[in-house]
Amino acid sequence: MRSLLWASLLSGVLAGRALVSPDEFPEDIQLEDLLEGSQQLEDFAYAYPERNRVFGGKAHDDTVNYLYEELKKTGYYDVYKQPQVHLWSNADQTLKVGDEEIEAKTMTYSPSVEVTADVAVVKNLGCSEADYPSDVEGKVALIKRGECPFGDKSVLAAKAKAAASIVYNNVAGSMAGTLGAAQSDKGPYSAIVGISLEDGQKLIKLAEAGSVSVDLWVDSKQENRTTYNVVAQTKGGDPNNVVALGGHTDSVEAGPGINDDGSGIISNLVIAKALTQYSVKNAVRFLFWTAEEFGLLGSNYYVSHLNATELNKIRLYLNFDMIASPNYALMIYDGDGSAFNQSGPAGSAQIEKLFEDYYDSIDLPHIPTQFDGRSDYEAFILNGIPSGGLFTGAEGIMSEENASRWGGQAGVAYDANYHAAGDNMTNLNHEAFLINSKATAFAVATYANDLSSIPKRNTTSSLHRRARTMRPFGKRAPKTHAHVSGSGCWHSQVEA
């Protein structure tokens, strides 16, 4: 009886609120609120010696609790923390050729190694056993990034009895990645690090001129950590027609991750708070993912634990990962596949069009970015859920054309502090932060009112796709967010 009474009272309170309007709601989003929330994340990180928000660490726990408490105290949402256990990994490393040290980054979940050995250049992209020369045994395999997951390359190198592996980038600049937790049916990993394209090419030239020896040391640490997603759904609105949006709460080891992805989660939090002034026709679900940087673990866990009925209640998913890059471009996920010949599930084209129309309405240029599997939309796409979102670029280099569009610096990364210690409050572009947060608010208000542009989903197709959700090596290549010209989070750096 008490629950029925409370539901009746809640319905009455919500009924007294005006329906959220896409024309007006974006104006409720203020820069000062975005910056206040971002500062809180930096404070969490800098309160501890690690100065980061890696999943399962104290600053990340503080982040999760902050989001939970801020949403809970509104009284507008049903909020819970979803517990899960994931394997954490970190490593120190050195790579030398003679007395010269080469910058290298150990891939997440790599085993340890200490070896001095010649380099063996692997044919093609190292994605099949035939690519590994017979004399790779006991040597360090040098493999080009591309085509298959880093975990596959590492396993194949181990099968060829390589002493260790080096993967070099296929675009300018350094690289890192994740192997994904080891899969017993695949075989053990070889120790593996990533280096830049330039350093990879130097090693190839030395190897072609004669043998070249490297000294590689990797000290890898791993432990299971308990961590949490935060889920908050409006108490009002149709719970069978859910508008879902999300971003990830964790950073890499190197820094506090205030753009990657503090910008996305704080934008969503500010929007969630502002939404409490209004009523909605369709339920809105805010999702805050853990352990994205280790292979989209939180979002994969969440989606894999939904049955077909619950999956079909989610009419669409919007992803916001790095929306305030300092040298930004305004990028929209290519839902219709017109730019990258890879469309999202039915309804994704309409999401892309909504964001395009919004930017057009305020005379802002925009470009598409690829659904490359490198952020938390992947599990939703693989389950047939229409998806979309925004991105402002990571380690990718801004072109002259894009610099002219947004007044940025050509020849410079969209985010020069991507996955680095400098991804703090000073790394945020305030203009991009506010523009994209207002665009997000517009989308939320639109779909909270009307989902008629998004086709109903089919249970059978969802079940068919679901089996593919938990991929053996996590996301794809480095979050280079493969995004068109922006690259991005190695969230995905599972795939070369």
From Swiss-Prot:
Q: Where does this protein chiefly localize? A: secreted
Which cofactors must be present for this protein to function?
Answer: Zn(2+)
The record ties this protein, via Gene3D superfamilies, to:
3.50.30.30, Zn peptidases
All copies of domain PA, residue ranges? 111-205
Pfam family membership, one: PA
The residues the entry assigns to the signal sequence are 1-16
Task: Tell me which GO cellular component terms the UniProt record holds.
Answer: extracellular region
Return the EC number: 3.4.11.-
Q: Which sites does the entry annotate for glycosylation? A: 224, 307, 341, 402, 424, 458
**Catalytic residues?**
292
GO biological process: one example: proteolysis
The EC category is hydrolase
**Known InterPro entries for this protein?**
M28_fam, M28_SGAP-like, PA_dom_sf, PA_domain, Peptidase_M28
Question: Subcellular localization, per the record?
Answer: Secreted
UniProt KW keywords: Aminopeptidase, Glycoprotein, Hydrolase, Metal-binding, Metalloprotease, Protease, Secreted, Signal, Zinc
Swiss-Prot/TrEMBL site (Transition state stabilizer) positions = 418
Supply the PANTHER family for this chain: METALLOPEPTIDASE M28 FAMILY MEMBER, PEPTIDE HYDROLASE
Its biological purpose: Extracellular aminopeptidase that releases a wide variety of amino acids from natural peptides.
Q: Protein name, please?
A: probable leucine aminopeptidase 2
Q: Which gene encodes it?
A: lap2
